[in-house]
Amino acid sequence: MSTVLLILRRCALRHWRLAFKQQLALMLILALGSSVYLAVRLASNAALSGFETFTDGVTRQPDWTVQALTGSLHEADLLRMREALGPRPVSLLPVVEETVTPASDKGNGEIGSRATWRLLGVDFIALLNLRGQAPAGLGASNMQSVRSGVYVSPKLGAKAGEELRLIVDDRVITLQVAGVVPEVPGVPSLPAHLLLMDLPEAQSVLQRGDRIDRVEFLSQDSPLFPSLREETGRLLKAHWQVRGGSDRRQLAGTMTQAFRLNLTILSLLALLVGGYLIFQALDGVVLRRRNEIGILKSLGVTDRAIQIAFLLEAALLGLCGGALGVLLGWLGAQAAVGGVTKTMNALYGATSEQQASLSVSEALLALSISILASLIAAWWPARMAARTPPAHMLGNHATPFEGGTVWRVEWIGWAMMLAALLLAQLPVLRFENGTRLPLAGYTAALLWLVGAGLAASTILRFVARKKALSAVWRIALSHLRRPTVRHRFAVAALASAVAMTTGMAVMVASFDHTMRGWIDRTMKADIYVSSAGAQSASSTHAITPKTVAELGREPGVEELAFVQAKTLLWQGGEVLVLGTNPVFAYKHDLYAWVQAPQQKEWWKSDDAITPAIISESWSERFGTHVGDTIDLAGHKVRVVAMNAEYGNERGSLTLPSEVFRAWFDTDEAWRVALMLKPGVDAETVRSRIEAQQPGLSVFTNAHLRREALRIFRQTFSVTHALEVIGVIVAVVGLGLALTSLLLERRAVLATLHSLGMSRREIARSAALEGLGVACAGAFTGIAAGLWLGWLLVYRINKQCFGWTLQFHAVWWHLAVLGAAVIITGMLVAAMVGRWAALLPSEHTEE
């Protein structure tokens, strides 16, 4: 071990001092790979944390949460629950809940740009009966000081006595801040977004009457009831919908699982491309020290000592690069968290996190990734350096390294691509709560990317078949006819990066093309109306029947229709149940059918079973098909058709409006669509409604279309950043590969210069060699990327989200991508060639 440490101190660290810029560049390369993964991970975790926190209440986690099968619970149900439980020591906490939006927050005109808070009404008497559960400042000792209004967290920034103007459903109301609940260690504190109010007052403000949304149950341990929690749940499940206390938080993670998993996979694919770059950089380090390694071996240093010394140096580089990657990853996460949060807010539920925090475990994970990647990348160069005889490493005519047999066997790449084709045919892994994991699809994508990179050498030799009379061309092509491992890795990195970018571009184009067609089919009304507080997918705002009637009496309105919505728990996952006017939808042909109903008037039934339409996401998530009969909230439902819906991956079931009202005992609307009379200006009507109804958001058809496409583009904003990083890394890798190759050939370059070849011609030869590698990588990458796009569109997307997309490629985008990679690769190669043309025949440390 002393020999290894001596080599590190006298050789490795000396090179670090003499060539500090090169070592810093290596650290940056390592940092880039780990920081991309860490940034995406921190951003998605921060958004998820905000999403989960939005479900938190004011007590410890309840043992059970009880809701009605359909509709709302009533105060009389509390007596039934208490009678069912008998003398068991279980506390009941009735709750009403509504999302609210501050009226002062005007946003920027975009859906989701305004804040979303929660107004929580709880029974203060029941809350105070829970020892240690009441937030500080609401203890029994000062119950008489409890005033009318809302209690808020200090994080909200409001003061006692201050008035808050809030949007609730379609109304703008004013509530007074009754007090600010201080934060005390060991006592539950209010989340920043939560407004707490006494239950009777909240019922009055929200116009709920005697209705409540849910009841939280907290069991108290007792020797008389050793299995109290399980017994309580069993008794309640006989009459009501019962969830475990942790289900709300777990459901938040489940809903966003596919979205977050896709981000993670993309960041890991970018890390794969970075792995090629790390290999080439460390291979260059070994190459620069070949003479030194040869001298050490001649002095009797063992192969094992040399290999261990290089691996330890690589680990040290990985540690330094990883530490830098943690910093870059944290900074990148701050930039990415906004985009990820907006996407989750629009598609899943309210989350307002704008900062990503870094934990010790996440930092250690990033360091581990960097060190592991460095060791893996350094293992092969270190092994070859240790095993190469000294005679092959010393002097001006050291033998060029062409790579081991495994790197020259191209059939391995083709075999991996064949395996990817077979894996793409396997079904998705399904779990009991309806979530899916396309493990075979992700594995197929990985094998296809790596296999395409390894098989790209075939294209490299095809490019080299070009006959040339010029000496510059002949020299450039001669190196490509017998490519070394550095050529192969350079073209593999380019092919993988271009394939990843092409595949994502095809998926985005397919989504865009499909979305536009779906929007044209389903958005035919002139004006769409929702509550101004509906800023996220979890918003519970509704429009009252009175307001709907006023909209129908608006001058210029010819037809009005509305959609009702409720969220239910079905087979362990949340689903959306919709109620629509089927006659209006049939008249205007609003459905984009995946499987059309057998009879046009699908809402009519000959028996007691309710007809319904499911979305494609529902079918993919739960395995329900047209013709199946399911049990939903105590009702028999027959699936008569399936429609395409691209804004909801949880799945939706559509009922006739009469059935919906009977099930849920409500006439409130979720969204309202207005058809205007011919010649009426939609913008004029929109402005008039907004002036008369400040609690509503009103969108013209054109505006809502733009918003839908904006949310779609926002969803893929992080994806585009990862694509750009991958291509940049691959092009830099090409430059590093050529640098190593030309360093290895510096004696040959000196000979060519002595024979009369000018330095400019040497630089041109290097540029043409880089052009050949770039062409092979670009052509292979685009071809492989088209199949990868097919995999993403028809397999991974379908299995993750349940959406069928129409395959669509923007060919001129792909042509621009290929041209950009080729031109950039040639320019990088030319710069390296100009530098190499000035190299002396003997290497000196720089």
Annotate each PLM feature.
Residues L18, Q22-L24, S34-P62, D283, ...:
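Alpha-helical transmembrane segments
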Residues T65-S72, T458-Q598, E616, E707, ...:
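Juxtamembrane segments of multi-pass membrane proteins
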Residues M1-L6, R10-L26, R234, A258-L261, ...:
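Alpha-helical transmembrane segments, especially those used as permease/efflux helices
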Residues F279-L282, A315-Y348, S361-R387, W414-R430, ...:
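Small-residue-rich transmembrane alpha-helices
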Residues S113-G157, A537, P545-V626:
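Short beta-strand boundary microenvironments
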Residues F20-N45, Q257-N291, A315-G329, I369-I376, ...:
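Hydrophobic alpha-helical transmembrane segments of multi-pass inner-membrane transport and secretion
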Residues S2-L272, G284-L287, D303, T343, ...:
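Membrane transport/envelope proteins' first extracytoplasmic loop
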